[in-house]
């Protein structure tokens, strides 16, 4: 397995992220060494809260929660999933699967011997975290999940499944705007069809604009700011946009070039919405 490691300098000067890094080495099924990063903040004898992030973010997501939790006497552990943040990044699409993330994080959990855990899982962190609870029930005391779940409906018609599979196979890559429109409409209609826009956009966008997307979703910038960022991104110059925020910079930090983005590109396709999900 070819594994990439983001240089530490990429994370220099991140706003509101003063935390010391901690690293654990695990072994993949082909014998490769894989290093997983995590935050470990607060009193060592405090009740342990495990914060698991989703796609395409990393432990930076929890930067504002950590101080509140530690001030309450809790110990906070926030890892970066393999492929994200300061953790190592397997370089091939086939390196990523739901099962492998569960296996890797299970090894990480055992190596650190964490116990009496309250797990908070968001997005993929919920999917992976719930499997960790099932596989290691004696290590967990409480479960809190948010914004997570499989967009799979067993009553979806065969015709709709064929439409989704045909869309993913034959349709042109959706634009960022088309993808966002589809995702924002997920509460109505069939979520699997709309989620397919996210799956296809992520996989087929070699230069997946992680930072720009996070700035849009988390900060809701004004129309002029969005227009400038869209233009700069189209020109391949988003890193130089005068409207690029600290949040965008932080979520771009793990990915110095496109080769590091295989995790966030590949993982949405592993959500089982159709038989083509693999």
Where are these regions (language model features)?
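Short, solvent-exposed loop/turn segments that connect beta-strands within catalytic domains
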Residues: 28-34
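Conserved residues at beta->alpha junctions
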Residues: 53-56, 255
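Flexible "cap/lid" subdomain of the alpha/beta-hydrolase fold that forms the substrate-access gate
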Residues: 1-21, 36-41, 48, 61, ...
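Short hydrophobic signal-anchor/transmembrane segments that target glycosyltransferases
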Residues: 68-70
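Short beta-strand element of the alpha/beta-hydrolase
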Residues: 46-53
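The serine-hydrolase catalytic nucleophile loop
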Residues: 55-66
């Amino acid at each position: 397995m070819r594994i990439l490691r983001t240089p530490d300098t990429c994370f220099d000067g991140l706003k509101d992220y003063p935390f010391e890094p901690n690293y654990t080495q695990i072994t993949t099924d082909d014998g490769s060494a894989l290093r997983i990063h995590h935050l470990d903040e607060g009193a060592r004898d405090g009740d342990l809260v495990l914060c698991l992030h989703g796609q395409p973010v990393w432990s930076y997501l929890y930067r504002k929660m950590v101080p509140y939790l530690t001030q309450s006497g809790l110990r906070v552990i926030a890892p970066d999933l393999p492929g994200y943040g300061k953790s190592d990044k397997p370089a091939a699409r086939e390196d990523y699967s739901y099962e492998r993330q569960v296996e890797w994080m299970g090894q990480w959990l055992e190596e650190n011997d964490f116990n009496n855990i309250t797990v908070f899982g968001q997005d993929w962190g919920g999917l992976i975290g719930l499997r960790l609870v099932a596989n290691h029930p004696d290590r967990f005391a409480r479960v809190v999940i948010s914004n997570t779940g499989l967009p799979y409906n067993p009553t979806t018609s065969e015709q709709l499944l064929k439409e989704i599979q045909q869309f993913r196979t034959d349709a042109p890559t959706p634009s960022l705007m088309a993808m966002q429109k589809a995702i924002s409409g997920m509460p109505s209609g069939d979520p699997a069809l709309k989620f397919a826009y996210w799956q296809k956009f992520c996989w087929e966008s070699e230069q997946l604009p992680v930072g720009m997307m996070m700035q849009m979703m988390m900060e809701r910038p004004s129309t002029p700011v969005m227009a400038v960022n869209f233009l700069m991104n189209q020109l391949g110059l988003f890193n130089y946009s005068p409207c690029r925020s600290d949040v965008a910079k932080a979520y771009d930090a793990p990915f110095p070039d496109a080769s590091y983005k295989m995790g966030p590109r590949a993982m949405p396709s592993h959500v089982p919405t159709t038989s083509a999900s693999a």
